[in-house]
């Protein structure tokens, strides 16, 4: 297990070859930190990508659709079992570590109070697995490093949680348990379960807890676990369904840049994020509480799937009407965008991205001056389509440009802009038996 071999294996699985040296450097960081912590080699290595959201702002938890891809940036991860029940996670990029000792990984799965930042995600993942798979031995050392821009709307927090969950689950053998086999039957099920670890909800027969405090869906997790190189993927949610994949034309290139304001899901930003989720839930409650027999819905998407139902709910929605309008309009863009990618229709994507950005600003209200300016700058720099993405209240934007001009566009758009060709899903790159 060498950095070069791991990077080469990742390229062989479909990652953009231009990323080879960056990933070799990332795995060098991880393996050097492992060697400093332990004398024996790691047992497992993974690549866990971030998520690029093309369309589908705040639709997933309402049962709507999203168009996403696995990003070219993400987490390099290695892990090995411990002889005790403790969990130690080392962030080789930050030079930081976190240890759950004495371990909370008991039948009680007691959460550690007062944790913030990435430590909270580690604690939540470890304790949820201990609760749902109480008979498994989850003690592990995990070393990771990321080249994702933090809090930029590329799902760095969800990717971290998935990295920890995958590592602990692999070492603990949870996929062989009756609990897993009875409840998780596909990668989409796994993605939905990982989302429930994050948001605290139960999944099928696997009971929930408090999660990390955000009330999100499984869009990010679905992209990370199901990504296809050079393709954008359509999903619908509640329940999760795959809608298909559309290849990004070879002469098109995604470019991503951050606005300079971190989209942290903490404090006021988390409250604003959760308010959008709560508004979607309130609309569903309005529909289901109106007393009409035979028309209860399991999601907001189901409540508006018929035009007459949508009109009925719109008439009832009052101050929630902008939230409803945004959901309906953004959800409808997904099949249109998939068709546009399939046809190579740049004009259609230009229109769809302009409308999505305008609706986020006017109806959803999750944009800030910096994200608005970033999208405007992308268009002025020559992008034929551009849009902000992620939870909002900071973060990043994507732009679509001709591949031949991508390098020049990156320099023109901003110093941190980078090419982001859709890559492979989470991959376990190598194991030792």
Show the residue positions of the predicted features.
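N-terminal pre-core extensions flanking Radical SAM catalytic domains
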Residues: 391-399
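Gly/Ser-rich oxyanion-binding loop with an adjacent helix/lid
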Residues: 2-44, 49-68, 99-107, 111-249, ...
């Amino acid at each position: 297990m060498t950095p070069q071999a791991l990077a080469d294996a990742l390229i062989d699985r479909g990652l953009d070859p231009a990323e080879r040296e960056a990933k070799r450097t990332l795995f060098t960081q991880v393996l050097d930190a492992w060697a400093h912590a332990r004398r024996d080699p790691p047992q497992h290595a993974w690549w866990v990508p971030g998520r690029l959201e093309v369309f589908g702002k705040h639709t997933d938890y309402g049962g709507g659709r999203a168009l996403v891809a696995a990003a070219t940036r993400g987490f390099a991860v290695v892990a090995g079992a411990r002889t005790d029940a403790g969990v130690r996670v080392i962030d080789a990029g930050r030079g930081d570590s976190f240890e759950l000792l004495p371990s909370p990984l008991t039948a009680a799965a007691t959460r550690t109070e007062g944790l913030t930042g990435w430590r909270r995600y580690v604690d939540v993942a470890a304790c949820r697995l201990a609760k749902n798979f109480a008979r498994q031995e989850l003690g592990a050392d995990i070393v990771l490093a990321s080249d994702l821009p933090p809090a930029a709307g590329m799902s760095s927090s969800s990717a971290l949680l998935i990295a920890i969950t995958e590592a602990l689950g692999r070492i603990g053998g949870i996929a062989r348990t009756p609990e897993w086999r009875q409840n998780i039957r596909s990668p989409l099920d796994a993605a939905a379960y990982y989302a429930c670890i994050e948001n605290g909800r139960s999944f099928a027969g696997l009971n929930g807890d408090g999660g990390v405090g955000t009330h999100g869906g499984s869009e990010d997790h679905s992209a990370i676990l199901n990504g296809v190189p050079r393709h954008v993927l359509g999903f619908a949610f509640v329940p999760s369904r795959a809608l298909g994949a559309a290849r990004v034309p070879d002469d098109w290139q995604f470019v991503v840049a951050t606005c300079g304001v971190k989209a942290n899901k903490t404090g006021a930003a988390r409250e604003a994020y959760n308010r959008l989720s709560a508004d979607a839930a309130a609309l569903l409650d309005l529909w289901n509480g109106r007393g009409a027999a035979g028309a209860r819905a399991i999601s907001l998407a189901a409540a508006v799937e018929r035009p007459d139902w949508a009109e009925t709910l719109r008439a009832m929605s009052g101050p929630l009407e902008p939230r409803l309008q945004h959901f309906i309009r953004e959800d409808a863009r997904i099949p249109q965008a998939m068709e546009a990618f399939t046809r190579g229709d740049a004009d259609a994507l230009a229109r769809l991205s302009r409308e999505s950005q305008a609706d986020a600003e006017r109806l959803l209200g999750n944009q800030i001056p910096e994200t608005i300016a970033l999208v405007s700058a992308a268009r002025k720099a020559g992008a034929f389509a551009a849009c902000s993405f992620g939870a909002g209240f900071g973060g990043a934007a994507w732009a679509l440009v001709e591949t031949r001009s991508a390098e020049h566009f990156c320099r023109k758009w901003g110093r941190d802009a980078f090419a982001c060709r859709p890559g492979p899903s989470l991959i376990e790159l190598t194991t030792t038996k």
